[in-house]
Amino acid sequence: DSIKISFFYFRYGVFVIAIVTLLNQDDKFVEYFFYCIFFCFTVLVLDGYFQYFNGANILGLGYGSRITSFFGDEKILGSYISRLWPVFFALSTLMLKKNKILFFLFILIFILSETLIFLSGDRAAFFFINLSSIFVILFTKKLFKLRFIILILSILLIVVVSFINPTAKYRVLDYTLKQMNLTDKNKREQEGLFIFSKQHTHHYITAYKMFLDNKILGVGVKNFRNFCSDEKYKSGRYSCSSHPHNSYIQILAETGIIGFLFLILILFVFCKFIYTHALFKMRKKAYFNDFEICLLSGIAMYLWPFIPTGNFFNNCLNIIMLLNLPFLV
């Protein structure tokens, strides 16, 4: 099964080539593509706030501890917005720079979207949107002021919201520290510190045991779920899950050294490009333009190693990430 799954990953290459072809053949495609993303993005943001204030979204879907909008039981609203943010921001700067009134409207949407990510309680998504912000602020030539202003205004709004309703703050900050055993000295002395949480720590140890037993090729793509209950891999009550919740650890466990080295090579090439751009920037030049840096900030999210992540082989997550590539080719 894992061989079949791996084989059909060529579809992502077809997806990128198809978009590149459309970009080259139709001058209006960028505009159509932008307004399509704009529609999806805006509807999600407005519906997310509607659900937050009313307890249910426009379709009547309620939420428990976290805002989900149209995603229902799937708590991926923050992840979806944060990952779509870089390509949307990049295209916005390209399409709306001549329309100042509309551009200020988009700034408002960006501020509201960043705040909504915080309200959704998705901690990884909140980290990613801030990582993208810092990336753009550090490496762009003209957009850094705009991105910095949006970030500051978003933080101010988040602070105000946290005072009015501290639930989101507890989920994103307080609960995170609690799960890592950083707030309870007695528990810390008894159990030690955890990597993000006890659940994550057990997943990571289990995945590492799988790697030690299958160093070259791993246990197979999407096979963590099938082997995590094996006694020789179990590391505690939270050993099992659909995936290890970290891309690099998942690749190590499921594809072994071969797959892991390929991912590290991609990370190395990416860092080399960014290092080259940084050198150019210090000389008042640019290796990448601001539009490309915005897109690269989206790729940086996927390559950042030290954060809990979704399934590396998740089709939806991969498609959103690949949306950045055609505009860089």
Regions found by a protein language model. Give the residues of each.
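Loop-to-helix entry and N-terminal half of a specific, functionally important transmembrane alpha helix
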Residues: L108-I109, S242, N246, I274-P308, ...
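Selective detector of the "anchor" transmembrane alpha-helix that sits immediately C-terminal
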Residues: E254-T276
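Membrane-interface catalytic loops of GT-C/OST-like multi-pass glycosylation enzymes that act
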Residues: K4-I5, F71-K75, S120-F128, S241-N246, ...
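A membrane-periplasm/extracellular boundary helix in multi-pass inner-membrane enzymes
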Residues: S120, T140-E191, H203-D213, V221
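Membrane-anchoring hydrophobic segments
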Residues: D1-F8, Y35
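Long extracytoplasmic/lumenal interhelical loops at the membrane interface
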Residues: D184-T255
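Extracytoplasmic catalytic-loop and juxtamembrane helix elements of membrane-embedded
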Residues: F53-G72, Y170-K185, L317
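Alpha-helical transmembrane segments of multi-pass inner-membrane proteins
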Residues: F10-V14, A18, K28-Y63, F71-I164, ...
